[in-house]
């Protein structure tokens, strides 16, 4: 390390003694030794994984930043369309990355997490970037202020910031690191450690480079930008659009900073349309002043290995971050919003492993107490912060007033339609919520607006046993457009696989509240009305609120969700053991590449469609159309089949008057319980039933009527349960029985209607 003139000299003996002492002293209890070697496994503190939040854990200061918030200064005072597809989710910042995606990935200066530790040798710092395609694309500055500096002036490495004053500035890229004091004296530090797999850059800062800092209360600030190879400082952001080598959107004298950390109080101004957690940041950068975006703490807590008692506050909105198991690369895919994918496409847009989702904890949330959960899908061209930015009253009425957690996945993009990568992201975010918060799986509901309404149909009808209610708002029944009696548009592999009208059959035990407007310019009323008619024809429990005067955006801007709150309270819990189950299986709707097969619900699963099989080649329309179905009734509950009751009334509002029609499912009356079931099968060659959930006693003789409507053929029936040794007959003729660890398997040949009897030996 070399110091410029004016620094305090130290003897070689003193330096050697300090190094030896540091080497032989153990780290304090709770602390972990660190070294900037690129091996990030020595960073072991527990992060909040909540954007903007900071804590100390095991002697590490850990700050989690907002993801995809790296848009620099708001110089023009208004929202701006991002470089990527996001027509309804503008940024406040104006900066845009160089178009060389192989180097910058449209996301190169996005700080994901900062960690700082301390020991007898000095400070240890690691910055995790959301995207790191090139180790020398980003540059990071950590400013440290103990309140001693009285020097004003610009930050030292081209950041373009004037305040706050700080004692020291630690600036580093993937290849070099320096520390500069408030008087401009600069020392070169050891080469940073880089871990490209973890997008991490580490740097060690000895106390000798930070005089009179150790053990003090300090305020830290962290900013990021793009490295200028010529100056080894911040690349300036010129006016105009970006080029392959240079960013754009700046102005003469504007800051070179794209992202700022330590912002726990980010706002989402409804009138402005801020969706990315960078409104305060972008305003501060326009003023070249980040003095309000810092974190003050006692450095001695790091050396002492302190762990604080951080817990998220209830009654507020967060962006939570989780690490996906999916490998899509890193960076942002721009996804051209014109041409063949004008309505969107299933390919992921946000590629990096760490993904955010919106999370609201209700005012009365108590960790450890099972809490209702609401999955709330976002619209096309908007993100996971949509409801915080546009309709925050949703969190009051569907969160606080129901004591419910609400979460909104990003779904890997603004236009993925929850079909492939977006569907998987929902499931991963859902698992993260359940893993870290106290949720009640029996009181889980699903809703969403526009494309999120489509998600409500799709996920709700593929997995109806996961939810208590489903409430699509202005959701198209099909991926992307349906004008009946015509086919959904555009044509292609999702014309069948993306059409939820095909699986309304599955909603027998999932009450739907459907909401659509009569003058909707994006989701035509004809498709919504046809979807509701299918619910009526099948007798599914539902209400269809039809608002004659409402356009596509009227309901979300009105921000009134009272009747949906009441709907969820009317059906607070799912019924996992219904008397009747209906399920239609489309193999083309599976996601075999992700290990996801939708082959039943409740006490039915293992459905195998007779032909053409369980996986479809692209363009194989016959395979896309193939489906099989079951309608089953257990006699063991002692109830007859349910009946349908029509519902119709005029709803006065709020927010607008609506014509409401629907059907209630009236439970069947009591009958003598018998140990058996009835199953009506179409185009299936196998099915499995869970007899315990059906109320059937496997130790007693079991009777079943099996009816096929497609000509029949070989059929495998699996009955899951604790069966003793049994024999079986079909229409009085013996059939072979295979005893398995799960229960019994019966190989049958079905033609019309049959009587199956299973008898314990």
Indicate residue ranges for each PLM-predicted region.
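Alpha/beta-hydrolase-fold serine-hydrolase catalytic core, especially in secreted/extracellular enzymes
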Residues: 259-356, 360-361, 537-542, 548-761
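Surface-exposed, glycine/proline- and aromatic-rich loop segments on solvent-exposed faces
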Residues: 32-176, 225-233
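Acidic/polar low-complexity flexible segments
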Residues: 32-51, 143, 147-169, 209-296
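The feature captures the conserved acid-bearing segment of alpha/beta-hydrolase catalytic domains
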Residues: 480-481, 485-569
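Active-site machinery of serine-nucleophile hydrolases
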Residues: 370-436
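Primarily recognizes the serine-hydrolase "nucleophile elbow" in alpha/beta-hydrolase
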Residues: 382, 442-503
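Gly/Ser-rich "nucleophile elbow"/oxyanion-hole loop immediately N-terminal to the catalytic nucleophile
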Residues: 363-369, 416-451, 461-467, 506
